[in-house]
Swiss-Prot record:
One of its GO terms (biological process) is regulation of Ras protein signal transduction. It holds the Pfam family PBP. GO terms for cellular component: cytoplasm; fungal-type vacuole lumen; fungal-type vacuole membrane. The keyword rRNA-binding does not apply. The keyword Cytoplasm applies. Specific and potent inhibitor of carboxypeptidase Y. It comes from Saccharomyces cerevisiae (strain ATCC 204508 / S288c). This is Carboxypeptidase Y inhibitor. Belongs to the phosphatidylethanolamine-binding protein family. The lineage of its organism: Eukaryota, Fungi, Dikarya, Ascomycota, Saccharomycotina. Keywords: Acetylation, Cytoplasm, Protease inhibitor, Serine protease inhibitor. Monomer.
Amino acid sequence: MNQAIDFAQASIDSYKKHGILEDVIHDTSFQPSGILAVEYSSSAPVAMGNTLPTEKARSKPQFQFTFNKQMQKSVPQANAYVPQDDDLFTLVMTDPDAPSKTDHKWSEFCHLVECDLKLLNEATHETSGATEFFASEFNTKGSNTLIEYMGPAPPKGSGPHRYVFLLYKQPKGVDSSKFSKIKDRPNWGYGTPATGVGKWAKENNLQLVASNFFYAETK
């Protein structure tokens, strides 16, 4: 139990240290419901703020979600994520540092939006809300990619960019056909600097359950 709580706090500390809460999540009360594991290869995992070469991240990575109820210990019950077999998820990758950390004219830049994902082992955990722990990859059958994956390509000399993955639970019974359209990658199509997934997620009533991120730079 304590390990889960410690990991949740370590995640929050990392979000704060690297400006993820302030610049992307926009919710200082956010508590992760589990771990979003992201791996480009065995030698290129995403690890809460590590640095990866851009060439290692050209193809879409593999994802796994590990739910741990104890990570939500300080979350009000009304706001806690309770797993259900029919849950649909949206996976996002966004860059809040486009074209640089001091120039936000393209920020956020949308790199991936994949919706209507299901847990691959959805039938192996309870639906009573008593589930304490499970780990699952995602079933992409029937999923809908709104924005195709684009690997990191920060402008030369623009400094390190944060590439942030976010896992959202979609509202019950709502698939992505009901979501607002993403008109462009820069600013997520809103045309306003420093605008992106937070606004889009709020429009579509998405619940953030986990996040991970890495840095990449073109020197």
